Amino acid sequence: MSGYILCQTKRAKLPYFIENISTNVYSIEELCYYLYHNLYLIDQTIMNEGLCSWIQEELELPALAAKLRSKISKFASAEDIVYPVFKEINYLTYEELNVRLQKMNEETPAMREKQKADALMENEMYVHAIQVYQNLLEREDLEEIREGMTEKVYHNLGCAYSYLFQMEKATEYFRKAY
C-alpha cells in the first residue's frame, strides 16, 4: 500500500469523534486510515453503535452500518468487525488485513498492551499511555515475556512524563530504565 487514496464516498458534515486519540474523521477513507494505523487501539470505544449511526446517517452507507451492527451485537472478533469497513472502499484485501491481525494475535497480551501504549504515545495521548504503562509494570510476568521489556516501559514512561513537563517523574523513570 503506497501513494494516496482518493476519497470516493461522501464526506460527512458532522465528524465521528475517536475518543481515545481525540481525533475527528470525516470520511470512510479517513476511518480506514485510522483503523489500519491504530489496530492496537481498536476497542468498544470506537466500534460501537455511535459509529454505526454515523456511517448510516453522515456517510449514507446503510448497508455497511447494518453489517457492523450485526457484528458488534454478536461480539465478533476485531477482524470480523474491521474487514467490512476496509472492503467498502477496497482499502485492504482480506489477506493483507489477516497478515496484520495474525502478527498481532501471535503477540502476548502484555506485548499487545505495550504496543497499545506506544500507539497512544505516537498519537500524543500521554496521560492514557502512562496509565497503560503503569498497568504493565504491575504485571509480574513482564520480564519473562521479553528480555528488557521492563526497561523499555520505564524509558517510555520517562518520555511520556517529559512531554507533560513533569521532569522530576521523567528523571525518576529514566534512571529506573538504566
Feature locations, PLM:
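Flexible helix-coil transition and linker loops at the boundaries of alpha-helical arrays
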Residues: R100-M104, E138-G148
